[in-house]
UniProtKB/Swiss-Prot annotation:
HAMAP family: PEPcase_type1 (MF_00595). The active site is at 138, 546. Its EC number is 4.1.1.31. It catalyses: oxaloacetate + phosphate = phosphoenolpyruvate + hydrogencarbonate. This is Phosphoenolpyruvate carboxylase. PANTHER family: PHOSPHOENOLPYRUVATE CARBOXYLASE. It comes from the Bacteria. The keyword tRNA-binding does not apply.
Length: 883
């Protein structure tokens, strides 16, 4: 076994040993023995020992109610520790991804070696780099914030232990700290008692900024600058920061009645307060460091006589005073006090930037570049990346809410019912009103609560400091009037600038119509004048996959993007595609580099804007070093996609994709929508109903409280199938379609697509990853334990289908086993399976006990309920992505 895996395995083994000691201290030898027996049986079962597999099932079925929770917690905590070790491994000197910042150097060298690219072209591509990461509070981050903090500390311990020069005494101290942290985690309840509020979610986002991004972003820019200097002789300008962060936490009200206008207003203030808090810490350091006397005449003129003896300090102290006054005012506002704005209130980034940049220029001019390029440069870059708002907010609302609000207004005004008008009539009315100088809203009108909420939200946007709200996203957008309606409501609220409004196309039909909708919009003169040559469109990955299956959805997403790129290029519009990806494959998740290089040519010209969801935020940005690594990967992928775009697919490949799309969609919908047994099977074979009890996000799991699979959100839909290891939404239909095309004699064509078309090879790679995490015997066990015998044939049919799908994908990829080209991921899945399997078996047992109690009309046993929640969290940790 090579060194990188042995280092990971030895850390995992060491952490497991410490956890074992903790369990023994807390609960006694007998519980540890029980856990160890189960672990050994699971390992042997994985190696193919059928007798031990049966013994594993019997042992877990026979656990007493008192043993359930300790056993569930032991395996769940072990998986959290394994994930922590793996995250550390990805940035450790012994890990294969330790050189991830090197990924930029590798990309630059690759670009320089292209005969048709020169340094000037590469430099231009660097200067136009734009990456906006949108943090969303999807309810897939199952781990509590308090435990995330402890995992970060454990990571630090692993780092110290890796130091070859560590003295025995220091090693002893670090091991002691490690034991304390693992004991603290064991004695902490891993399941939240209450759902987080939208404000709690926003605070979780601010914690990511403070604990990781605040340091990670300047570190990434130093790394980028170093590689550019070395490879191109090019220095990044001080004010060049290609990365920005936006958040949906506190702004996303789609289907979440808990996010109100008042909540958004509060989160905007809280975000500004947090920014002042973090910048105050920076300025405090600069006051201490910038004790220099030499300064340029310009700086001396700025500080006057009073500050001449220590000009830099003087300026920093003045800035500190402004930050403190701003923070006090924001604190009062957060408490609900209405105070007049103080003189010098910081509302714009320039107010922070100017004194800092004046110091920077003076230090450079006076031969103190080494000092200027230290902490001061990091702070300047933070001003550009985070600034006064810290993170900007997107507002997201469903299109029908705007339609209903306008319907209520037109009915009150006696001019008809907007909701029942044709699309042409809606557009004519909206354009007329957008061009009108008089207000539309009557003065003393009392709207319904729902309409008032929509109007109040628009008012919050109009009143927010410019630059603190990034975009207004319209979910379930279907028509040009959906976009114009939002512009009209914003105009009525008194907005004084052109707010980017992004339609989100998310079902199969909407993706197919996206280009037509945008073409109609761009043909409206008023609209063209408003957008000033820039347009953002959001592509939905989760709902389209839930609607049509993963193969049809991914092709519809590709075609929609391709058509939009060409339409905007023809119209001279700079298009920013906003990707609403999830962490799991069924919601569009894929390794960043592969995913970006598989997009249509030209899709990243306007930069990359992408959601980072739930638990993926922790995996990709949980530590400063991991942040550097993730941002470096994105940077290299954007540069490569823009300078070495993938080829346009051949027409014959497009025809094959059309074919695959139709067959896979028919297969997927044939089961999910048309098979009468499917919904009862889904409800019994997965913990879908029990998931509702988990206090995950602030958003309800269903768009409508009643209703079947259609009303279920994409996240719980995927989460449920991930739990029982069938992973159904991420593959159903895809393999059947591939098999049919192979039978039609087109296997060699598929192999060529896999070899020469990044879009197709990435799709197959994603399927392989899903297949690696799926498990036939576990899915079968859930059926045996939980599903009515009349539904067993459907379960068997689906498992047989999965087995066939694996064979066809391996044949097309010319591989003998899954993940052959990504052994690191295969190793990681293998490592965790030994600990995830017992949790799956135990979960099926707990679901059986819980449902039996309910059928008998007895009140639930809290030990069973609590253990069930722990297994759900544990399996999520084992799968490394939930929804």
């Amino acid at each position: 076994m090579n060194e990188q895996y042995s280092a990971l395995r030895s850390n995992v083994s060491m952490l497991g040993k410490v956890l074992g000691e903790t369990i023994k201290d807390a609960l006694g030898e007998h519980i540890l023995d029980r856990v160890e027996t189960i672990r050994k049986l699971s390992k042997s079962s994985r190696a193919g020992n059928e007798a031990n597999r049966q013994e594993l099932l019997t042992t877990l079925q026979n656990l007493s109610n008192d043993e359930l929770l300790p056993v569930a917690r032991a395996f769940s905590q072990f998986l959290n520790l394994a994930n922590t070790a793996e995250q550390y491994h990805s940035i450790s000197p012994k890990g294969e991804a330790a050189s991830n910042p090197e990924v930029i150097a590798h990309t630059l060298r690759k670009l320089k070696n292209q005969p048709d690219l020169n340094d000037a072209t590469i430099k231009k591509a660097v200067e136009s780099l734009s990456l906006e990461l949108v943090l969303t509070a999807h309810p897939t981050e199952i781990t509590r914030r308090t435990l995330i903090h402890k995992m970060g500390e454990i990571n630090n311990c692993l780092k110290q232990l890796d130091n070859t020069d560590i003295a025995d005494y220091e090693r002893h101290q670090v091991m002691r700290r490690l034991r304390q942290l693992i004991a603290q985690s064991w004695h902490t309840d891993e399941i939240r008692k209450q759902r987080p509020s939208p404000v709690d979610e926003a605070k979780w986002g601010f914690a990511v900024v403070e604990n990781s991004l605040w340091q990670g972003v300047p570190n990434y820019l130093r790394e980028l600058n170093e590689q550019l200097e070395e490879n191109l002789g090019y220095k990044l300008p001080v004010d060049f920061v290609p990365v920005r962060f936006t958040s949906w936490m506190g702004g996303d009200r789609d289907g979440n009645p808990n996010v109100t206008a008042e909540i958004t207003r509060h989160v905007l203030l809280l975000s500004r307060w947090k920014a002042t808090d973090l910048f105050l810490k920076d300025i405090h350091v600069l006051v201490s460091e910038l004790s220099m006397v030499d300064a340029t005449p310009e700086l001396l003129a700025l500080v006057g006589e009073e500050g001449a003896s220590e000009p830099y300090r003087y300026l920093m102290k003045k800035l500190r005073a402004r930050l403190m006054a701003t923070q006090s005012w924001l604190e009062a506002r957060l408490k609900g006090e209405k105070l007049p704005k103080p003189a010098g209130l910081l509302t714009q980034n320039e107010q922070l930037w100017e004194p800092l940049y004046a110091c920077y220029q003076s230090l450079q001019a006076c031969g103190m570049g080494i000092i200027a390029n230290g902490e001061l440069l990091d702070t300047l870059r933070r001003v550009k990346c985070f600034g006064v708002p810290l993170v900007r907010i997107d507002i997201r609302q469903e299109s029908t809410r705007h339609t209903e609000a306008l319907g209520e207004i037109t009915r009150y005004l006696g001019i008809g019912d907007y909701e029942s008008w044709s699309e042409a009539d809606k557009q004519a009315f909206l354009i007329r009103e957008l061009n009108s100088k008089r207000p539309l809203l009557p003065r003393n009108w009392e709207p319904s609560n729902d309409t008032r909420e929509v109007l109040e939200t628009c008012k919050v946007i109009a009143e927010a400091p410019k630059g603190s709200i990034a975009a207004y996203v319209i979910s379930m957008a279907k028509t040009p009037s959906d976009v114009l309606a939002v512009h009209l409501l914003l105009k009525e609220a008194g907005i004084g600038f052109a707010m980017p409004v992004a339609p989100l196309f998310e079902t199969l039909d909407d993706l197919n119509n996206a280009d037509d909708v945008m073409t109609q919009l761009l043909n409206i003169d008023w609209y063209r004048g408003l957008i000033q040559g820039k347009q953002m469109v959001m592509i939905g990955y989760s709902d389209s996959a839930k609607d049509a299956g993963v193969m049809a959805a991914s092709w519809a997403q590709y075609q929609a993007q391709d058509a939009l790129i060409k339409t905007c290029e023809k119209a001279g519009i700079e298009l920013t595609l906003f990707h609403g990806r999830g962490g799991s494959i069924g919601r569009g998740g894929a390794p960043a580099h592969a995913a970006l290089l598989s997009q249509p040519p030209g899709s990243l010209k306007g930069g990359l804007r992408v959601t980072e969801q739930g638990e993926m935020i922790r995996f990709k940005y949980g530590l400063p070093e991991v942040t550097v690594s993730s941002l470096s990967l994105y940077t290299s992928a954007i540069l490569e996609a823009n300078l070495l775009p993938p080829p346009e697919p051949k027409d014959s490949w497009r025809h094959i994709m059309d074919e695959l799309s139709v067959i896979s969609c028919e297969t997927y919908r044939g089961y999910v929508r048309e098979n009468k047994d499917f919904v009862p099977y889904f409800r019994s074979a997965t913990p879908e109903q029990e998931l509702g009890k988990l206090p995950l996000g602030s958003r309800p799991a269903k768009r409508r409280p009643t209703g079947g699979v259609e009303s279920l959100r994409a996240i719980p839909w995927i989460f449920a199938w991930t739990q029982n290891r069938l992973m159904l939404p991420a593959w159903l239909g895809a393999g059947t379609a591939l098999q049919k095309v192979v039978e039609d004699g087109k296997q060699s064509e598929l192999e060529a697509m896999c070899r020469d078309w990044p879009f197709f090879s990435t799709r197959l790679g994603m399927l392989e990853m899903v297949f690696s995490k799926a498990d036939l015997w576990l899915a079968d066990y859930y059926d045996q334990r939980l599903v009515a015998k009349t539904l067993w044939p459907l379960g068997k049919e689906l498992r047989d289908l999965l087995e066939e799908d694996i064979k066809v994908v391996l044949a097309i990829a010319n591989d003998s086993h899954l993940m052959a080209d990504l052994p690191w991921i295969a190793e990681s899945i293998q490592l965790r399976n030994v600990y995830t399997d017992p949790l799956n078996v135990l979960q099926a047992e707990l679901l059986y006990r819980s449902r039996l109690t309910e059928e008998q009309g007895k009140s639930p046993d809290p030990r069973v309920e609590q253990a069930l929640m722990v297994t759900i969290a544990g399996v999520a940790a084992g799968m490394r992505n939930t929804g």
